[in-house]
UniProtKB/Swiss-Prot annotation:
SUPFAM superfamilies: PRC-barrel domain, Translation proteins. The lineage of its organism: Bacteria, Pseudomonadati, Pseudomonadota, Betaproteobacteria, Burkholderiales. NCBIfam families: 16S_RimM. One of its GO terms (cellular component) is cytoplasm. Binds ribosomal protein uS19. It is found in: Cytoplasm. This is Ribosome maturation factor RimM. The gene is rimM. It comes from Cupriavidus pinatubonensis (strain JMP 134 / LMG 1197). Pfam families: PRC_RimM, RimM. Residues 144-221 form the PRC barrel domain.
Length: 221
């Protein structure tokens, strides 16, 4: 159940038919979330559309494996951050919505869900475009020797000789396997990047709790 870019993939563009203007629907106070946001929120998708006429929403997951989204019973629906801001939960804080998920299921590559308090299509349409965030604590436990990509970000990567290769800044899925993007500083101070296949042939240890990964990889590769 290794996640595929959980919270890291760029959302697909939302297209509105030409000439159609968005209709403003006031969100009920019961949906608005005024408390401080949890510090372990992870972006896992976005609301692509309303689904049906009874307030269901359709979510486009960022990951091919939507198990984390289906497992969580509480979602934070946040507006996209303004241009130039880092995509964090706090950057999307304006009029935060928090919903409890009564039902959810996979549907043709998406996840459709019924949220408590969202009772009609107009209200569901008002949530369109919002990013869906869930707590990392609400992810299902991964199986042995499998990892969520969000847990690998920020891990220090060293080789068996004790040489520091850099820090995981992102991941790539090339269809055959996953690849660690390892950021490091070049001698001139500019940013460099190493691409290390995340496969058994090169992996030695992965300690997500200690944020450390050891690989069979040279500094000159």
């Amino acid at each position: 159940m290794t996640e595929r870019k959980q919270g890291a993939a760029a959302p697909r563009p939302l297209n509105r038919p030409q000439g159609e203007s968005p209709k403003a629907t006031k969100l009920p106070a019961t949906l608005l979330y005024a408390d401080p946001l949890p510090d372990d929120l992870v972006e896992v998708g976005y609301v692509g559309a309303a689904y049906g006429i009874r307030g269901w929403i359709k979510v486009e997951p960022h990951a091919n494996d939507a198990s984390a989204l289906l497992h969580a019973r509480r979602w934070w629906l946040l507006t996209p951050p303004q241009a130039g801001l880092v995509a964090t939960a706090e950057a999307s804080r304006a009029q935060a919505v928090c919903v409890r998920v009564a039902q959810s299921r996979e549907h043709s590559g998406t996840v459709v869900a019924q949220a408590t308090g969202v009772s009609d299509r107009n209200l569901a349409e008002a949530l369109k475009g919002r990013r869906v965030w869930i707590r990392r604590a609400d992810f299902p436990a991964p199986e042995e020797n499998e990892f969520y990509w969000v847990d690998l970000i920020g891990c220090a990567v060293s080789n068996e000789q004790g040489e520091l290769l850099g820090e995981v800044s992102g991941l790539i899925d090339n269809g055959a396997h996953q690849i660690l993007q390892v950021a490091y500083a070049l001698p001139d101070g500019k940013a460099g990047e190493r691409l290390v296949p995340f496969v058994d042939a090169f992996l030695r240890t992965v300690d997500t709790a200690g944020k450390r990964i050891v690989v069979d990889w040279g500094l000159d590769y």
